[in-house]
Amino acid sequence: ISEACNVLNKGGIIAYPTDTLYGLGCDSKNEQSIKKLNKIKNRSGPISVIAPNRRTAIDWMFVKKNHEATIKNKLKNGNTIIAPIKNNICSNLIAGNKNTVGIRVPDHLFCKKLSKLFPHPITSTSVNRTGEKPLTKPDDISNEFISDIDLIIDDVIINCVGSKIFLFENCSWKQRRR
């Protein structure tokens, strides 16, 4: 975990295991890292981040107090919530329309420890180039991205699907991905 934090602090890119898929991570406040990540993915645009716990995730969001319990409940099971975020939480390069960002709390010990130790939100996007299937084996990740990624955290082969994604907008919910 300390090695991953060092790589992130230096503007590097990591591939790390989550409870759903391997993720590509960088410091969400480091614009050079985000540009490098976008180049790896062959795209630009919104990128989700991970939080160490639901309280932190809600603290990053710009939502009314009376919506917090519902959001906290939706964050269960590794779901991603797209919601407006407070200023200076992440770079605008990862934000979507209306200053929204997808935030999730993975049910994976490595993610929880890493996101608790690192001082900024860490990006979490599947390990693949846009339009291709996510890579689930550390060896495949290494072979495909050997010159692009600074550190691969080798856990196990992960054969899951991506998280469910919910959009919280204008006090209502829309499911974006099942």
Regions found by a protein language model. Give the residues of each.
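Active-site-adjacent structural elements in enzyme catalytic cores
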Residues: I1-R178
